[in-house]
Regions:
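Short catalytic/ligand-binding loop motif for oxyanion handling, primarily in non-cytosolic enzymes
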Residues: 31, 86-90, 127-130, 160-163, ...
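Conserved Class I SAM-dependent methyltransferase catalytic core
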Residues: 103-164, 169-172
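Proline-centered helix-kink/hinge sites
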Residues: 83-84, 116, 162, 276, ...
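S-adenosyl-L-methionine-dependent DNA methyltransferase catalytic core
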Residues: 1-40, 45, 141-145, 153, ...
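Short Asp/Glu-rich motifs
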Residues: 53, 72-73, 130, 161-162, ...
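Core alpha/beta nucleotide-donor-binding catalytic domains of modification enzymes
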Residues: 2-115, 125-127, 136
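Short, conserved loop/turn and helix-capping segments at secondary-structure boundaries
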Residues: 97-101, 132, 136, 183, ...
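Short aromatic/basic micro-patch
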Residues: 82, 118, 263-266
Length: 345
């Protein structure tokens, strides 16, 4: 059911007139969700294999381009994207706006010059919690442009994706926006890849006794009660570039019927990230895993796109109503560090 559902639901279709611009598009996970909701997209991405993947599978065109402030974009009614998140990831060095990989000045500049009806970006949860000072700056700059800016931490598992994946979703608009409702039930690993687990014939993916021993030592030292295998009766752990492509202690792995354990293959990882089976990836295996690990789950993107469609069709608020909806950055109600920590960051 899950496989058939994503294969059909996420097929691109053109039913909307609004044009969507996807910045830092990656392989097209976010764009795929918007195309499935009926939008036309155009993307920009600096990684060649990801661009090739996007162009192989989507109706829109992705351009190989390293973006910078002042870049000349085509007209767009909606801007979406995933500004590089490495500076804020719990796995990164957390240098924030001092990091050259920070894409927010570019995203804000695009919004400033194109003035879309709606914008939406995805980033790691850590941006809103450990880096309140920078997130407030981003929201303040976007609010100055005349947008109501709202955000929420969403877990993809609550929207049909068979994976626990918390991400910060931020939306700017001039009307009203409702985040998608939580789905009734969670999709499990077994439902997503159960037909693949024991049919994959790739001996190179089988964990060696030495790798099993290394993992056992790691889990003992980290007080891990249950092995970090993927369990058929529950959703997967968060997929990352590191635990997909690397042979590490926290690698994504399944247990076979004969007791051996195996690393995931690309198609299994893609399913767990809600990419349809007809969606084909370009590049080496490592590059394909990186594309999957960095992507916005298309099924989550689709749910967000449907909500954006509702907002896009609403009349723009009058000035009085707009001012009543603007929320000061320090009233977001999130648990952050204190002012001293902000100044030291």
């Amino acid at each position: 059911m899950y496989k058939e559902y994503i294969n059909e639901t996420l097929r691109p279709r053109a039913t909307e007139r609004a044009k969507v611009l996807d910045l830092f598009a990656g392989c097209g996970g976010l764009s795929l969700g918007f195309e499935a909701a009926g939008y036309e997209t155009v993307g920009y991405e600096c990684e060649e294999a990801a661009v090739n993947t996007y162009n192989r599978n989507l109706r829109g065109r992705c351009h190989l381009q390293r973006l910078e402030v002042g870049f000349d974009y085509p007209e767009a009614d909606i801007i979406i994207g995933g500004p590089p998140c490495q500076p804020f990831s719990v796995f990164g060095n957390q240098r924030g706006m001092e990091d050259a990989r920070d894409g927010f000045p570019i995203f804000i500049d695009a919004v400033r010059r194109l003035r879309p009806r709606v914008f939406l970006f995805e980033n790691v949860r850590n941006l809103a919690y450990s880096h309140r000072w920078y997130f407030e700056l981003i929201v303040a700059e976007l609010s100055k442009l005349g947008y109501i800016v709202e955000h929420k931490c969403l877990n993809a598992v609550n929207y049909g994706v068979p994976q626990n994946r918390e991400r910060l979703i931020t939306v700017g608009h001039r009307a009203a926006f409702r985040f998608p409702k939580v789905a009734g039930r969670k999709t499990t690993v077994g439902e997503a890849i159960g037909d693949l687990i024991d049919t994959v014939r790739d001996e190179g993916k089988i964990l060696t006794p030495r790798q099993d021993e290394y993992i056992a030592v790691y889990e003992k030292k980290s007080n891990c009660i249950n092995p970090r295998d993927l369990y058929p009766d529950r959703p997967a752990r968060t997929l990352t570039c590191r635990n997909l492509a690397g042979c590490t202690s926290d690698m994504q792995r399944v247990r076979l019927k004969d007791g051996r354990r195996r690393r995931l293959v690309v198609r299994e990882a893609a399913r767990l990230q809600s990419f349809p089976d007809w969606f084909e990836f370009d590049g080496s295996e490592i590059k394909q895993f990186n594309q999957i690990g960095n992507a916005v789950p298309p099924l989550l993107a689709y749910r967000l796109a449907l909500q954006v469609k509702e907002t896009y069709g609403l009349p723009v608020m009058d000035e009085k109503s707009f001012n009543a909806h603007v929320v000061p950055a320090d009233l977001f109600g999130l648990e952050y560090g204190n002012t001293a920590e902000r100044k030291q960051a």
